[in-house]
Regions:
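Generic low-complexity, intrinsically disordered sequence content enriched
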Residues: 15-17, 24, 46, 75
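Histidine- and acidic-residue-rich, metal-dependent catalytic cores
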Residues: 33-187
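N-terminal membrane insertion elements
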Residues: 1-22
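Short, charged amphipathic alpha-helical "coupling" segments at sensory-output junctions
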Residues: 22-37
Length: 187
């Protein structure tokens, strides 16, 4: 009788544990989906203000995924596991978030920008990075750290001729290097 009761209790506990695990997994998936949705909404707001179609962010996201996948196949130098690749791809959607702080006349100007206007346009990298630095308690979250790298340094160039900091080679985080390639390709 005691053994029977213990087996029954163990089976009930196991079933309850499986239900709880299933609930927690569903909640985690919902949280991840909502986070991804908010990032895409925010990036589309910036694109809308910038007069773009909304496809640039999607292209950057997909190109970043593809480039990271290939890079991970070619080298282990950057430790690009699946979760890291997914996080970089998601953060890539925020690469131009700093454009929200650039004057609309410059953002939407038809034709070539003047030298002064281009200097103002270049500030979007620093503006985006500063916006992310001001997120308080979220500042140290891995996604925010990667988004910060991408925002600030996605216009850096391997030869040091990029902006805003003139970083050279592997001084540029791999997240920003990959998004830079995707951004130039989709320009």
């Amino acid at each position: 009788q005691i053994v029977y009761q213990r087996v029954t209790n163990t089976m009930k506990l196991y079933a309850k544990q499986r239900r709880l695990t299933s609930l927690i997994t569903a909640q985690i998936n919902e949280k991840e989906k909502n986070s991804e949705m908010l990032i895409h909404i925010l990036s589309h707001i910036v694109e809308f203000r910038n007069g773009e179609s909304g496809s640039h962010v999607l292209h950057i996201h997909k190109l970043t995924e593809m480039l990271l996948e290939r890079l991970a196949q070619k080298t282990e130098k950057y430790h690009l596991d699946g979760d890291t690749r997914a996080m970089i791809a998601l953060a890539s959607s925020l690469h131009d978030i700093g454009k929200i702080g650039v004057d609309e006349k410059i953002l939407n100007k038809p034709g070539k920008l003047t030298k002064e206007e281009f200097e103002i346009m270049k500030t979007h990298t620093v503006i985006g990075a500063e916006m992310l630095e001001q997120l308080g308690i979220y500042q140290n979250e891995p996604l925010v750290k990667i988004a910060h790298q991408i925002c600030r340094w996605h216009h850096e160039r391997y030869d040091g001729k990029g902006y805003p900091d003139g970083l050279v080679g592997d001084e540029i985080p791999i997240s920003a290097q990959v998004v830079s390639v995707a951004d130039v390709y989709d320009a």
